[in-house]
Structure formats: structure tokens, C-alpha cells
A protein has these predicted regions:
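Extracytoplasmic, non-cytosolic globular domains
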Residues: 116, 160, 164-255
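N-terminal, active-site-proximal structural segment of metallo-dependent hydrolase catalytic domains
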Residues: 20-111, 115-125, 303-311, 315, ...
Length: 341
């Protein structure tokens, strides 16, 4: 009997060791549109009036704290409960709200740090990157200004570019995006997303000119599906893992399945949130190897409406000005990589 228990104990320790070892050699990357994460303080420089205690949405300190708690629950649930290594976020009002989200996560073994710059967007919403400093060492961060076409272009969200070093000494460049919306219709507004795509593509081309084997990720809410012109043709995120385009977008393979997606529009799922990567991450000798088939929406059951007309849709915070107390109108998306020596 004693031999049996010793054998059992050894087996358990063996599994724990190799599970932890496997986890340390993986990189879990996600992006999440957190849907209007505003504080309750009026910023006279932005149009944040709807998200004030006396505003249309009656955005109180209690509702704000509830939202922070909801979002941190989502982050903790990712990666089989271990949380992501890198997490892009968008629709954050400012650094303060993003930092409060960071501090509320309380993920054991994690040390999340925030990379963020204020954007010129009229509503004041920005993008940011939360990274675990144990897995990603920050080397450089900058914002890329997107200039929209027209005689009087309105300001839009900047693109965040963060460069860091992974545990295996690989340098990684991460672009976090929140491209202009489809307000006014997809075709009419497409020119604005094309401007954002050109901004990112110029930066990617510059990186690849210096280092043709540069490891690059682009993530975000693109307000376009993977097959649309701006992300696929202009930014250059195509469907071939080792193709001629600078980027590979694994979400293209999921794009035609209307039962999958990060956003539900009139009953049809779409991947307007997606993640692309350098094409060589699929090669056998890459130090950052994409795990084929890992691209997905994080469709946790608790993130979905349970009943009524919108059952199965993302459980959002508001429907119009009607407070629902949910999470977000988007689902997170994620991909995984193997870190090689």
C-alpha cells in the first residue's frame, strides 16, 4: 500500500511539473474590447457626458466598480484560469481606468504592467496593453497617429506599438488597434479604416526592412472582418501561414462560420476582433511558433445572455441606455504560441 501511495504521489508531482513546464514555454495572447470602460469623473476635454452619474446612462461609482469586477473575472478565466501573458484592451477612457482594471485582476503568479498613451479620440477612448513582466520585458512603446482623409478629419484612436523581449530572448512587436467604426455604413466608412491600415502597414514595413524576420503581432477591434479590404489587402494579413504577405491571420479560417465570432450583429457572429502575426511564426524553425488551431473567441458561458430575445449574445453593460450589468458587447479573442530556444 505504501508503495502504491508513493507511486501515486510521484505521478501527481510528475504531471504538475510538466504542466508547469509546458505553461512556461507557451505564450497566451488575447485582445478584449471592454465596452466603454469610463470612470465617473467629467473630463472637459472629451465627450464623456453619457458616462457620468447625472448623465444619460446614470454611470455611478457602484456601476463602475461592478464593471471592473466583471472584466477582471474574464481576464482571470482565460488560459485555463492562468490569465493571458499579453492582453490588448480597447474602449478604455484613460490610464486610470486601465490601471484599476490591472490592479483588480489579482492573478496568482502574475505581475501585469500597463502600456498606454492618451488618444485624441473625441470620446476619449484609448487602447492599451497589459503584459506580464515575467514573460515580456518592455523595451519600447509609442503611439502611432492615424490621420483620416477629408478636408476636416475628426481625430480617432491612435495605434499602440509596444516592443518587448520574451523569455527566450525573442524580440516581439505588438500593435494594439481600435479602428474607426462603421458609422454611416460599412462602405462609406471603409476609407477611414483603410487609413488606419495604411498607418500600421507603414510601421510593419519599416520593422521588416530593418529585420526581415521580425516577430510582429497585430491585435484589436478592427471594425472589419479578417476578409475585408483594410485588414487583409492593405495591412497585409492573409490566410497563408507562409505566404507572400507580411502577416498571417488565422481568424480568416473561422470567418465564414456565422456560429463563431467576437461580436454578434443581428443574430450573426462576426470576427471584427482578431489577431494576426508574422508569417514566419508558422515555420518550423521560428523561436515564436504559432500553435495551429489555437485562434478562437473566448466564449465563456457566463459572458452570454441566458434568456430573452438576445439569448446567446454577449451580455453587455448597456442596451441603449438600459443598464444590463453585464460584461461587454464583445468577446475576447486569443491565440497561443510555443516559445523555442
Amino acid at each position: 500500500m505504501r508503495i502504491f501511495y508513493k507511486t501515486l504521489l510521484f505521478s501527481v508531482l510528475f504531471l504538475i511539473y510538466f504542466s508547469a513546464s509546458g505553461q512556461s514555454n507557451r505564450l497566451f495572447v488575447a485582445h478584449y474590447n471592454v465596452e466603454n470602460l469610463f470612470d465617473t469623473i467629467d473630463d472637459p476635454k472629451t465627450n464623456d457626458e453619457e458616462f457620468l452619474p447625472e448623465g444619460k446612462n446614470k454611470w455611478t461609482a457602484e456601476r463602475y466598480a461592478h464593471k471592473i469586477g466583471r472584466l477582471s473575472q474574464v481576464v482571470r478565466a482565460m488560459n485555463a484560469g492562468a490569465g493571458p501573458d499579453l492582453l490588448g484592451i480597447c474602449e478604455i477612457e484613460n490610464r486610470q481606468v486601465a490601471d484599476e482594471l490591472r490592479k483588480s485582476i489579482h492573478q496568482k503568479g502574475r505581475n501585469y504592467i500597463l502600456a498606454h498613451f492618451e488618444s485624441p479620440d473625441n470620446r476619449g477612448i484609448d487602447v492599451g496593453l497589459l503584459y506580464d513582466s515575467k514573460k515580456f520585458k518592455l523595451l519600447h512603446a509609442q503611439s502611432l497617429t492615424v490621420i483620416l482623409p477629408g478636408e476636416k478629419p475628426w481625430p480617432t484612436r491612435d495605434v499602440l506599438l509596444v516592443t518587448g523581449q520574451l523569455k527566450n530572448k525573442t524580440r516581439l512587436h505588438v500593435f494594439v488597434n481600435h479602428w474607426p467604426s462603421r458609422s454611416g455604413g460599412q462602405e462609406k466608412s471603409e476609407i477611414n479604416r483603410m487609413a488606419a491600415a495604411k498607418t500600421v502597414r507603414r510601421a510593419i514595413d519599416s520593422l521588416l526592412k530593418v529585420d526581415p524576420t521580425a516577430h510582429i503581432l497585430t491585435m484589436g477591434d478592427f471594425n472589419d472582418g479578417p476578409a475585408d479590404i483594410a485588414p487583409r489587402q492593405i495591412m497585409g494579413a492573409d490566410s497563408l501561414p507562409n505566404g507572400p504577405s507580411p502577416l498571417y491571420n488565422p481568424f480568416l479560417a473561422l470567418n465564414s462560420d456565422t456560429t463563431q465570432g467576437s461580436y454578434n450583429y443581428r443574430g450573426s457572429w462576426q470576427f471584427i476582433d482578431h489577431i494576426s502575426m508574422s508569417t514566419h511564426t508558422s515555420s518550423s524553425n521560428s523561436k515564436l511558433k504559432y500553435l495551429a488551431g489555437s485562434a478562437k473567441a473566448e466564449k465563456f458561458d457566463f459572458l452570454l445572455e441566458k434568456e430573452g430575445r438576445y439569448a446567446g449574445n454577449p451580455w453587455r453593460t448597456y442596451a441603449g441606455s438600459n443598464y444590463l450589468g453585464g460584461y461587454s458587447d464583445h468577446l475576447p479573442v486569443s491565440v497561443q504560441f510555443e516559445l523555442r530556444k
